[in-house]
Amino acid sequence: MDSYIIQSLTDARQVLNQAQKHPESPVLRQDHPWEGNLIQTGAVLYDGDAKLFKMWYYTGQFFARLTPDGPVTETVEGSRKRAYAFSRDGVRWEKPNLGRIEFQGSRDNNMLPDDSPPPSYWDPHETNPARRFKGLVWTDDVCAPMTMDLYYSPNGFDWTPYEGNPVIDTSPRTGRWRPTVFMGWDPIRKIYAVHMESCLHRRCPLGKRVIGRAETPDGIHWNEPQTLIVPDEKDYPDTEFYAMAAFTHADLYLGLISIYRTTNMRHYPELIYSRDGIFYHREYREPFFNNGEYFGDFDDTSIYIFAAPIVSEGRVWIYYIGANWRSPEQLYEKGEKARRAIGLATLPVDNFVSIDGGKLRPGILVTRLFSFGGEELYLNMEGHGVSPELRAASPRIKVEVIGPDHKPLEGLKLEDADPLTKTGRHRVSWGGKSDLSKLDGIPIQLKISIQNAKLYSFQFE
């Protein structure tokens, strides 16, 4: 992601690799009368024991009413519902009959009570099974001082309020803790965290939406939000930050920040990263995946990520709210075609950023000096196709090991290396030999030659 391990790059560059939308997106859409024209995520979790993806979501029916001053957004009274779905593969979702709410004379539906919050996070360190799920719910308007109540649940459905509510109270200030995306347990900082719009944008020092972070050791005692990310001189003047979903991978924090362009009312995600969870870097200022291409696509206007990405089975699963309207004018223009639904974008877990080598001649990556534990070196790579027009060489990655005296080690030079040519994760070898255990704990550098290929990551085992 960054240059932390990189000493130099020659004829090679770091490239952002976009997440790919699943071809069946939207994966959760309106197909019941109680779901209206709006579906948006409340929470998405992966249950490793049951091997199920679980989603709590909201529904509603919106329309634009024309007034002398222009269209205004309205909600059909009583249309806002809460519901639940699950999936075995993350793509095809089932909406079970929960039998909890009556709708048009029947309880055969997947609706949940209005006072049933979606889980804010699942707590891996909770010793009380009845409190394994935590839900935090706003109780006041965003334009007034806001409070938040804490609820506990053993299963994500049956909730008990914390007796000391509220656990968050922004008074006397006008509160602004949302859009709120809970990270849950932060394994690097060893604390629970949430990211949010940290002040009401009209009252922020910049007069814009910005992203903050708050932390708690127990879900009850929260610190004041700290503003982390604000638009800078490289951004367009109409750029604001609507929300951020953050998660950790290896020793990095990764964030999907929602870029909001107020002129065209469009939202799209940008990938950012941090090594301490506080100072974030925006090296790759381009969409991590794109809005819908065609007018009327369910996500042609806005992509909101209000659920932390899930890492499972070697892939990152990003469930997002896609909308083809943002403003009352857009809602009025789309009419019956206006909708919000839930899409899915994925990518392999190490493939966020790659080092791309040249097609005609190899690019060279030289790492900083480091020591490792393990016996063998593995690379995760992708081989590009041969380009007849450029007469490019076949994909090829080779590795050289440099000792603490900055000289290539005998038998581990580039000319000794067995070339890696196919997409996937491969063990590195030199003349058929891969054992590096004698170098365990010794400072070394790697010199990696990359031609017509992408290098995603390397790891010692």
Residue ranges and their predicted role:
Residues M1-E461:
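Carbohydrate-active catalytic/glycan-binding domains of CAZyme proteins
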